[in-house]
């Protein structure tokens, strides 16, 4: 029986993870749950799952949860703050950690799981975007196992030979006959909207994704295609690709989740309904297969499958991310920080939709100008850079 810590338990990925665990209750025990500040949802999860441990990033929320659990005679030990999340990520009795905390906040807890040599189900793409080689080196150093949860990276993973699956971050695609990886994306809700109308997009419009059910931040990132840009950076690290080996393709139907092209002309594609329970189940039981609760794909009802080149004038954030990927670690760390700040401001109705790109570009340019030669050889140096980039973004936001 696998014993799990679920980081980001109250979010979309966390909920899907627990759904898969419930489908296969004889195979999984939920030992610990971690979240940010959603006390009510966390209380409900603790009532249902009776975990030994829980952790809340917000100390006040942790205290409220502790009181609520105690008054209901639930014996779950509650930890607080980033330290609490790191603690439940490295518990001796846990062998598998679902890393699903959104954004930079997930970096340290995820790295704690890596340093404890756990099986990491990586849904937090920002951890790799922010730390890159440092993360990959830590996985090897501490004997952790890395399995990608993002639907696209999981699709690529499934289309690659086991010898690559077992050596993520250090694989040689060329030696295994792989010519290129095709990273697919739906293009979001505005792929056919007139570009001149994007300035009027509201948060409500941006979070209404046509295919996937996701949280607000990732939904906005999908609308700008920054999400695909971050996934591009993650794929570069996971699969050790060159620029020539990694391509982005718009696929509006979200049926093919990504593809791998081989030198002999073969293309392997992973297909399925757009439901995160599929890649989650794949990683939770790897290398076995278990039920995810997702309906099988009915090919008679799919209709057409279409593919388009990405238009960078429509998706400038995608171009920013791809450029940052080849500019160095300072660029990807800085861009991720800027994007988190600008998307939060957009969701709070403080800036417009097209301002997101403008803020991201300003911060990226400033970070590249000031920190190009900065030695980023520790988590502390990355976190310092992340903080400085957020300060740059906050300054830029005040001028909008």
Curated annotation (Swiss-Prot):
UniProt GO molecular function = 1-deoxy-D-xylulose-5-phosphate reductoisomerase activity; manganese ion binding; NADPH binding
Listed EC numbers: 1.1.1.267
Q: Which reaction does it catalyse?
A: 2-C-methyl-D-erythritol 4-phosphate + NADP(+) = 1-deoxy-D-xylulose 5-phosphate + NADPH + H(+)
- Name the coenzymes or cofactors required: Mg(2+); Mn(2+)
Q: In which pathway does it act?
A: Isoprenoid biosynthesis; isopentenyl diphosphate biosynthesis via DXP pathway; isopentenyl diphosphate from 1-deoxy-D-xylulose 5-phosphate: step 1/6
* Residue ranges the record marks as coiled coil: none
Keyword list (alphabetical) reads: Isoprene biosynthesis, Manganese, Metal-binding, NADP, Oxidoreductase
Which one GO biological process term can you cite for this protein? isopentenyl diphosphate biosynthetic process, methylerythritol 4-phosphate pathway involved in terpenoid biosynthetic process
Residues given in the record as 1-deoxy-D-xylulose 5-phosphate binding sites? 125, 151-152, 186, 209, 222, 227-228, 231
Q: Where does Mn(2+) bind?
A: 150, 152, 231
In terms of domain of life, where is this protein from?
A: Bacteria
TM spans, by residue? none
What the entry lists under PANTHER family is as follows:
1-DEOXY-D-XYLULOSE 5-PHOSPHATE REDUCTOISOMERASE (PTHR30525), 1-DEOXY-D-XYLULOSE 5-PHOSPHATE REDUCTOISOMERASE, CHLOROPLASTIC (PTHR30525:SF0)
What this protein is reported to do is described as: Catalyzes the NADPH-dependent rearrangement and reduction of 1-deoxy-D-xylulose-5-phosphate (DXP) to 2-C-methyl-D-erythritol 4-phosphate (MEP).
As for family, the record states:
Belongs to the DXR family.
Which HAMAP family does the entry mention? DXP_reductoisom
Under which name does UniProt file this protein? Answer: 1-deoxy-D-xylulose 5-phosphate reductoisomerase
Organism expressing this protein natively: Aliivibrio salmonicida (strain LFI1238)
């Amino acid at each position: 029986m696998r014993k799990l810590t679920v980081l980001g338990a109250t979010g979309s990925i966390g909920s899907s993870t627990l759904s898969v665990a419930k489908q296969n209750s004889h195979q999984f025990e939920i030992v610990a749950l971690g979240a940010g500040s959603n006390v009510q949802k966390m209380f409900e999860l603790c009532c249902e799952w009776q975990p030994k441990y829980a952790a809340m990033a917000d100390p006040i929320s942790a205290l409220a949860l502790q009181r609520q659990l105690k008054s209901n005679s639930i014996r779950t030990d509650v930890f607080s703050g980033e330290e609490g999340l790191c603690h439940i990520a490295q518990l001796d009795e846990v062998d598998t950690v679902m890393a699903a905390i959104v954004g930079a906040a997930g970096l340290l807890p995820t790295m704690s799981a890596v340093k404890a040599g756990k099986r990491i189900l990586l849904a937090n793409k920002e951890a790799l975007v922010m730390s890159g080689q440092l993360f990959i080196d830590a996985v090897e150093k501490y004997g952790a196992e890395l399995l990608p949860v993002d639907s696209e990276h999981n699709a690529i993973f499934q289309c690659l030979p086991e010898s690559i699956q077992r050596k993520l971050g250090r694989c040689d695609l060329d030696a295994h006959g792989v010519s290129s990886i095709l990273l697919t994306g739906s293009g979001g809700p505005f792929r056919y909207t007139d570009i001149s109308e994007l300035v009027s997009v509201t948060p409500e419009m941006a979070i209404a994704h046509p295919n996937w059910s996701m949280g607000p931040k990732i939904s906005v990132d999908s609308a700008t295609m920054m999400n695909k840009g971050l996934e591009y950076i993650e794929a570069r690290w996971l699969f050790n690709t060159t620029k020539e080996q990694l391509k982005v393709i718009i696929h509006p139907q979200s049926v093919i989740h990504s593809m791998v092209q081989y030198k002999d002309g073969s293309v392997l594609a992973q297909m399925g309904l757009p439901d995160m329970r599929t890649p989650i189940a794949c990683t939770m039981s790897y290398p076995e297969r278990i039920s995810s609760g997702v309906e099988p794909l009915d090919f008679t009802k799919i209709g057409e499958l279409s593919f388009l080149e990405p238009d960078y004038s429509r998706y400038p954030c995608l171009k920013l991310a791809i450029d940052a990927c080849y500019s160095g670690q300072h660029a990807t760390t800085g861009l991720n920080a800027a994007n988190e700040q600008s998307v939060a401001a957009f969701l709070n109705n403080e800036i417009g939709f097209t301002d997101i790109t403008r803020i991201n570009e300003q911060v990226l340019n400033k970070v590249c100008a000031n920190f190009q030669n900065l030695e980023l050889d520790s988590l502390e140096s990355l976190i310092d850079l992340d903080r400085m980039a957020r300060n740059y973004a906050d300054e830029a936001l005040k001028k909008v």
